Amino acid sequence: MLDKIIRIATRQSPLALWQAHYVQHLLQANHPGLQVELVPMVTRGDIILDTPLAKVGGKGLFVKELELALLDGRADIAVHSMKDVPVAFPEGLGLVTICEPDDPRDAFVSPHFAHIDDLPAGSIVGNSSLRRQCQLRERRPDLIIRDLRGNVGTRLAKLDNGDYHAIILAVAGLNRLGLASRI
């Protein structure tokens, strides 16, 4: 197995690359001498940023290209965030392993407010998760919830540019990218 190169399909976002490098490290730590290379890809979900996910295909938008790379032999494995993995897989593919989970909490991120309860009525909060939107509407029906797409850096830039009063992101993603100070 040491003469074979394991190719990992991954999205090109900084967080996806972090996760793929993490799996690369685990594989090489457990199999010294194993060659592992990343195969970064752009998915439809990375390209279509101006439409809510539910309207353009949902979670599958982020994995289709990775699945095709596995099926046509350009990659041997794919690394992806579990939250975006579809329930059903194409024939010939499946879920082989799950890494130990990181912090599952959501993070409230705002340059001016310390807590969601500090936001004035009518404040604009961004996120792209239907689950988070429902939770926000239940807790604070007086807030304006707007879809927010893009990688973590893009979302933080939109917040910093004043497009939103606050955004909700995954704690794990912020930690992995060295951005815990934004919480």
Swiss-Prot record:
Pathway: Porphyrin-containing compound metabolism; protoporphyrin-IX biosynthesis; coproporphyrinogen-III from 5-aminolevulinate: step 2/4
A Pfam family of this chain: Porphobil_deam
SUPFAM superfamilies, A to Z: Periplasmic binding protein-like II
A GO BP annotation: protoporphyrinogen IX biosynthetic process
The EC number(s) this enzyme carries: 2.5.1.61
GO MF annotation terms: hydroxymethylbilane synthase activity
Catalytic activity: 4 porphobilinogen + H2O = hydroxymethylbilane + 4 NH4(+)
Repeat recorded as keyword: no
Top-level taxonomic group: Bacteria
Cofactor, free-text remark: Binds 1 dipyrromethane group covalently.
Similarity-based family: Belongs to the HMBS family.
Miscellaneous comment in the UniProt entry for this protein: The porphobilinogen subunits are added to the dipyrromethane group.
NCBIfam families noted in UniProt: hemC
Function: Tetrapolymerization of the monopyrrole PBG into the hydroxymethylbilane pre-uroporphyrinogen in several discrete steps.
PANTHER family the UniProt entry points to: PORPHOBILINOGEN DEAMINASE
Protein name stated in the entry: Porphobilinogen deaminase
Gene source species: Yersinia intermedia
Lineage of producing organism: Bacteria, Pseudomonadati, Pseudomonadota, Gammaproteobacteria, Enterobacterales
